Amino acid sequence: MAVAAAAAAAGPAGAGGGRAQRSGLLEVLVRDRWHKVLVNLSEDALVLSSEEGAAAYNGIGTATNGSFCRGAGAGHPGAGGAQPPDSPAGVRTAFTDLPEQVPESISNQKRGVKVLKQELGGLGISIKGGKENKMPILISKIFKGLAADQTQALYVGDAILSVNGADLRDATHDEAVQALKRAGKEVLLEVKYMREATPYVKKGSPVSEIGWETPPPESPRLGGSTSDPPSSQSFSFHRDRKSIPLKMCYVTRSMALADPENRQLEIHSPDAKHTVILRSKDSATAQAWFSAIHSNVNDLLTRVIAEVREQLGKTGIAGSREIRHLGWLAEKVPGESKKQWKPALVVLTEKDLLIYDSMPRRKEAWFSPVHTYPLLATRLVHSGPGKGSPQAGVDLSFATRTGTRQGIETHLFRAETSRDLSHWTRSIVQGCHNSAELIAEISTACTYKNQECRLTIHYENGFSITTEPQEGAFPKTIIQSPYEKLKMSSDDGIRMLYLDFGGKDGEIQLDLHSCPKPIVFIIHSFLSAKITRLGLVA
């Protein structure tokens, strides 16, 4: 995960549209150095604006800016600026298109390159420079697979001299954007590779150095149409400013970077590849910033769930799995001696608890979670005092245990606020109970007294053990017992299940031929759901 850390000294806070709005002077940590930035929080974005002159930062003597050129001739502020060495594989930058890899024969030679714009993605380039920067218009990024990249004739560091014959050598940055926008579907670029411009293409303001990228423009936006206005949907960069969309970001504390002074907060990208860390002058201000950003992110969840449902259609994630709730949690990394956590996207459907490493963008990705646990075989086993919470003295963790054929699988999660903790624990418990009512009955093969049988557990009717029917015969019921008669249940953790209904035969021993834990957990879920339905627990 690329970590760009930002530090915050809070400014005035306000409210608008029912969501928190806030602005203030902050600091941003880029390549191990802190830099002041102005941070503005809106309903759906966090905007970082450079407060340090780009001239002092990159030695050019002027400010820098950048624009991404896309979409059927449309140009809008986009992923311009320098890119750290860990930039995603889908983007060519000055760190991937090294000067020594560019043929010497084209250096400082004018070339004509014809580019056919794509319906989605447009030219697929980012540009920097302009008359106001005393620099030519330079290609600073090329998105792989899009129009410019497909020509195999354009390079990061190419100066654009003209567009369809229109001279850009004395153009401002905005004039160049407009020229590219009006160029039509077939674009003839006159370019010249400038090795001496490589440092300029690489560097920008501290804000432009923050590693935060969205997928290439041709990727479908979550739940949105291809005609959605890009300005509010995608990451943007313009005149030393970056706007980070908050939708499905993960806002947390003390995960990517140690915070002994308790004055930092972290914003993780939906793809879990990048992190921005904000730091304030004191812990109280950090908490205020955290609460405001976290609140805005939470307010966007309803829209996200609706978009995911629309994206997945009637079938849901897989066979009528309707999404009931989703969101980010911190998950304890197993096997670590210290409390180390990682982001986990947790999704609750009508029947399952799903865990993803990142927010799926394409429909197919929803069908490949890292873990899938049936709620019927899952129980909440811990929610209360413990260690490792983001706020000193406050524990916000809970654990789940699931009975599987491999044994019991446990996950320890951490919520960010008490409200989040209550919502998640309530949703999981209710999900288990609803799943019990929805599924109503499970059965499994077993051996009882050396006879092949079938154990059936029904939500309403309790337990029954029947013989496996022989050809031409009906199954015979050996044991039928309601839940009220169950005195005790246990297992050996390997294959044996023990049930005691208080009858003359005493304890019943059933060989399930596999790990009994799923059945044990399902019995617990049925009992818990029935007790809750009867109002015996609050």
UniProtKB/Swiss-Prot annotation:
Matching entries from InterPro entries are given as: PDZ, PDZ_sf, PH-like_dom_sf, PH_domain, PHsplit_syntrophin, Syntrophin, Syntrophin_4th
Its biological purpose is as follows: Adapter protein that binds to and probably organizes the subcellular localization of a variety of membrane proteins. May link various receptors to the actin cytoskeleton and the dystrophin glycoprotein complex.
What keywords appear on the UniProt entry? Acetylation, Actin-binding, Calcium, Calmodulin-binding, Cell junction, Cell membrane, Cytoplasm, Cytoskeleton, Membrane, Phosphoprotein, Repeat
Q: In what way does this protein cross or attach to the membrane?
A: Peripheral membrane protein
Pinpoint the SU domain residues: 482-538
PANTHER family, per database record: BETA-1-SYNTROPHIN, SYNTROPHIN
Q: Where is this region: Calmodulin-binding?
A: 518-538
- Positions carrying N-acetylalanine: A2
Q: Which SUPFAM superfamilies match?
A: PDZ domain-like (SSF50156), PH domain-like (SSF50729)
Phosphothreonine occurs at T214
Segments forming domain PH: 19-298, 322-433
Q: Does the keyword Phosphoprotein apply?
A: yes
**Per its record, how is this protein called by name?**
Beta-1-syntrophin
Which SMART domains does the UniProt record give? PDZ, PH
Localization, per the record, is: Cell membrane, Sarcolemma; Cell junction; Cytoplasm, Cytoskeleton
Q: Which GO terms describe its molecular function?
A: actin binding; calmodulin binding; PDZ domain binding; structural molecule activity
Q: From what organism does this protein derive? A: Homo sapiens
- Which Gene3D superfamilies has this protein been placed in? 2.30.42.10, Pleckstrin-homology domain (PH domain)/Phosphotyrosine-binding domain (PTB)
- Give the sites modified to Phosphoserine: S87, S126, S205, S219, S232, S236, S389
Its post-translational modification remark reads: Phosphorylated by CaM-kinase II.
Q: Please give the residue ranges the record annotates as the region Disordered.
A: 205-237
